[in-house]
Amino acid sequence: MTPFEDRYKNRVSEIREIFGEENYLRIMFDIEVAWWYAINNPKAGIAEFAIFFNEVKHKFSYKRIKEHECETNHDVVALVRFLKEDCGMTNAHYGLTSQDVVSLAYSISAYKASKFIGTKLGSLCDDLKTFYGSVDRMVGYTHGQKATPISTQNLLDVIINEDKIGISSMRDRLKIRPETRFGNGACGDRYSIKNVENEWEFEKNVKRCLTMVSCAHDISGLNRSTYSRQTDYYPYIASLSETIKLLSLLLKRESVNIWLLASKGIVVKINTAQEAGSSAMPQKVNPIEFENAEGNAELCEAMANVMINKAMSSRLDRDLSDLTVMRNLGSMFGYLTLAITSMSRGLKRYSLDADLIEETISNSHEMLAESVSLMMQKNGVAGAYDIAKGMFMSKKDMSREDFEDCVMGTEEIPEEIKQELLKLEL
C-alpha cells in the first residue's frame, strides 16, 4: 500500500514502531492505567506509581485487546473491557471520554517522533557542513545565470542558522512539550463530572495522572488546556505540523538546489562503479537521492497541510473525522524521515567539484560587473550603471585578460578609476 511497508521499511523503522497499532494501544493502556491508579490511590506519589506500573505493564496484551475490538468495533471500549475483565480494574476509564485517551496518545507519539526527527536533523546539519565545507566559495546563480561568487559559510548559515526558518530554529520548535485536553468531559466543560464529583479533587487527580504518564514515557511534563470542547483541536500537533511543513519546504528547496548544481556538473558522485543511472543509457549517473528527498518532502508538506486543517476543526462539540486523519500522523513523520534520510545519503555520496568551481569562477569575470558599477558610483562617475551594463551585458566566460581589456577599452571611465577597477579580484 505504501513504500513504508516494503521498499523503505528499514529507513522508517523507528517511526513505524512509534506509530504502529500495537504501540498506539500500549500508550493508551499506560494512560488508562495511570488514571485508574490516580483515582484509586489518591495519596500515592510518583515513586509508588512507578513500582505499580512496572508490575502491571507486563499485563498488556495486544492480542486480547484486538479480540475484544472484534466485538466492540471501538478500540478504546475494547481496551477498557480488557482492563476490567483481564486486569481487574473495574472502574477503569471512570469520568473519561475516548477523546481524552486518544488525543493524549497521539500527542505522546508525536512527541517521541519529534525527538527522533530532531536527532536526524542534527546528523543532517553535520552532513551539510561536510558537503559544503569542502570548498570556501561557489558560483552564485540568480535567475539561473552566474551572478557573483558566494561564501559556502553564508550558504550554510542560511540553511541551518537563519532565524525562524533555519534547521536549528525549527529543530528547537520540535522540542515543545505536548499539550492535552485530558479530563475535560463530554463537551469540554466537565458538566457531568461537576454533577457527581468534587471538581477540585477531580482536577487534582487529572494533574497527578498526567505527571504519572509523563514519568512512564520520559516526558518533562505535559501541558494541559482546561478550555476545550470534547474534540481536541490538537494545538500541539497543529503546531508541530506547521513546523514540519516548513521543514519539508526547506528540504525540498535545498534538494532542488543541489540537483541544479549537479545538472551544471558542480556536484559529482563519489563512487558509481556498481550502480546504474538508467536502464537504457549506460553513461547516466542520476542524483536520485536528492530527487527522492524532494518527492518525499512534497508528500510530507501535503500531509502536514491536512493535519493542520483537520486538527483545528470539528462539527460542533465532537465528530470522528479528525481521528481517521490522525491515524495517518505517522505517515507525515514517515515522509519527513525519508526526505531527511535521502538528503543525508545524497550528501555522503556526492561531492562538490572544487576544481571546476574555481575554473568557472576564474573564467567568469563578468561576475565583477556589480563591483565595477559600485566602484564607479563611489567615485562619482556619471552614468556608472549604464557604463557597466554596456561593458558586461550578455558577456559570458570572461577571462581575466578579457576583463582588463574591457576596462581599459571603455572610454567613459577616467584613467585613475580604471586603475582602481583593475585591482578588483574574484
Give the role of each language-model region.
Residues 1-21, 276-426:
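Catalytic-core signal marking the mid-to-C-terminal active-site face
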Residues 101, 143-154, 197-204, 227-231, ...:
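Alpha-helix capping and helix-loop boundary segments enriched in small/acidic/polar residues
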Residues 132, 136-139, 262, 315, ...:
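Coiled-coil heptad-register positions
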Residues 1-189, 194, 201, 205, ...:
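A helix-coil-helix interface module used to build multimeric assemblies
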Residues 166, 229-310, 314-317:
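Glycine-rich anion/phosphate-binding loop at the beta-strand->alpha-helix junction
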Residues 133, 175-178, 259, 266, ...:
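Alpha-helical coiled-coil oligomerization motifs
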Residues 31, 35-38, 117, 121-124, ...:
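Amphipathic alpha-helices that form helix-helix packing interfaces
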Residues 208-229:
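A short, charged helix-loop
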